[in-house]
């Protein structure tokens, strides 16, 4: 078992056209569904929809910190619907890091495999999935409003993996190598690892 196995199981249990995998302790605002459906209905051939988010630390919402700022910058090109179908732009965004918050995502099941996540990935299974789906024709819809809250705490799986020796870095490097030559991947790793501090308390 593992995160990917659990997420794939949850995904398979839904027999609806759209699926959101709600993570434990995350919070979805009352307008989350409305915003997701609005984005998906306005899109041309949607693959998935995702939103901006806020963090929940010690029970309180946090709307601004270094990690959230970086992720907003990564997603800046997609604040207009005209860019949602651009394979080039979303691959360029993903080539610098994973700006998409996994629990914010609503999946269009007809466009994705029955098991969307690759078993074996520990920390970057979402980034790895977005990289694969970024090659598909269709739209990555983006809601720029923070309509859900992602809880950051010591017991989260992400915090556990980052805390392990070399637990996350090999996966991060492997992801960068999907986009960049070795020297550039190593350079980006230097900056990306600093952002991991925001996932620890």
Give residue ranges: language-model regions.
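Glycine-rich, basic loop-to-helix element that forms the pyrophosphate-binding segment
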Residues: 1-14
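Conserved nucleotide-sugar donor-binding catalytic segment
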Residues: 75-169
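The conserved acidic donor/metal-binding loop of glycosyltransferases
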Residues: 23-27, 52
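Non-catalytic, C-terminal membrane-associated alpha-helical segments of glycosyltransferases
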Residues: 161-174, 186-201
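Short, high-confidence coil segments that cap the C-terminus of an alpha-helix
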Residues: 16, 43-46, 138
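Conserved donor NDP-sugar-binding/catalytic core segment of glycosyltransferases
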Residues: 31-71
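Short aromatic/hydrophobic "clamp" motif used to bind/position activated sugar donors
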Residues: 19
């Amino acid at each position: 078992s593992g995160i990917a196995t659990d997420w794939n199981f949850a995904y398979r249990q839904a027999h609806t056209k759209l699926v959101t995998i709600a993570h434990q302790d995350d919070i979805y605002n009352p307008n989350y569904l409305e915003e997701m459906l609005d984005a998906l209905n306005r899109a041309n051939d949607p693959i998935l929809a995702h939103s901006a988010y806020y963090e929940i630390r010690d029970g309180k919402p946090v709307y601004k910190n270094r990690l959230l700022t970086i992720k907003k910058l990564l997603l800046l090109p997609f604040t207009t619907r005209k860019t949602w179908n651009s394979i080039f732009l979303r691959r360029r965004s993903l080539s610098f890091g994973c700006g998409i918050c996994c629990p914010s995502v609503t999946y269009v099941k007809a466009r994705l495999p029955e098991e969307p996540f690759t078993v074996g990935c520990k920390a970057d299974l979402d980034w790895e999935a977005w990289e694969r789906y970024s090659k598909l024709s269709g739209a990555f819809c983006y809601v720029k409003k923070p309509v859900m809250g992602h809880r950051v705490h010591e017991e989260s799986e992400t915090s556990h993996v980052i805390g392990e020796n070399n637990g996350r870095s090999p996966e991060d490097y492997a992801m960068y190598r999907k986009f960049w030559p070795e020297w550039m991947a190593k350079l980006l790793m230097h900056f990306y690892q600093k952002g991991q501090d925001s996932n620890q308390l």
